[in-house]
Amino acid sequence: MSEPSALLIQSLEKGLAVLESFRGHASLSLQEMARENGITIGSAQRVAYTLEKTGYLFKDPRSKRYSMTVKAVGLGYSYLYRQPLFQHAHAVLHQVNQECGEIVNLAVPDGDNMVFVMRVAPARHIPEYLPVGTQIPCVATASGRALWALLPPDELDLRLRNVTCAKYTPHTTTDVDRLRALIDEARRDQYAYADEEFFAGDLNVAAVIYGDNGDPLGAVNISVPKPRWSLARAREELGPLVIRAARAISKRN
C-alpha cells in the first residue's frame, strides 16, 4: 500500500468524508458518523464540531443529531451554475420539455453512478422523491448505460464484472450478459433506455452530451410514466428527440 502524500491534509479528508456520508441521510448521530467512516467517536466529534462551527452542519439541541445546512447545499449550486455545460443546457431542456410534455433531466457521471444535476418538469408533475443531486447506479438508468456504451471494451468488461446489480424493482436488469446487450444496443442506436429499472412505473431514455474535445460530459434523460408510454412508443418518439437535444447541447460547449 502506498504511503499517503505529504500534501494530503488528513483532517480535511476526514471532514469531507463525513459530509459525504450524509448522502441518503437526513441526519446522523456521532456514532453513525463514526461507523459510516471507520473513525473513532472522538474523531467524529471533532470533525462534527468543526463543521458545525463553520456553518456546514446543524446540531439539534434535543436529539444531538447533525444535519447538513443550506451553506453545504450552496457549494453544489456554486458548481452547478458556474459550469458552461449547465448554463447552455437549461434552454435545451426547456425546449425538449415543451415538445414532449415530460420530465427532462441532465445527469453527469460520478464513478459508477449518475448524478441528476438539472431538471425541467411539466407543471402537472407530482414527482417521486428524487431531488436534484440524487445518485443512481449507471447500470439502472438510461443515462449511465448511454455513457458506458462509449467505454473501451476492456474497461466495460471490468466495470460489469465489478458492478453491484441490486434489484431495485422486479424489472431491474441484474444479469451481466443482458446488461452488456442493452449497452451494445445503446452504442448502435446512439441512445439508451431503462424500463422501470430504478423506480416502478418510470421509463427513461438518454443520449450522451460531448465537450469540445469530444469527451463525454453527461447525458440528457427524458423520464416518462407507464402505462401512458409504452417502451415501443418511447423509443420511436423520444429516442430521436433525446439525440437531437444532446447534440444541441454538445454544439454549444
Segments predicted by a language model, with ranges:
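Sensor-regulatory modules in signal-transduction proteins
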Residues: I209-D212
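Juxtadomain coupling helices with adjacent low-complexity linkers
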Residues: S2, A200, L217-N253
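Amphipathic alpha-helical effector-binding/dimerization core
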Residues: S63, S67-V163
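Short, basic/aromatic recognition patches
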Residues: H88-V96, L160-A207, R252
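Short amphipathic alpha-helical signal-transduction/dimerization elements
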Residues: R23, G144, W148, P152, ...
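Conserved GNAT-family N-acetyltransferase fold
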Residues: G55, A207, V220
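N-terminal helix-turn-helix
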Residues: M1-Q87, H94, R247, K251-R252
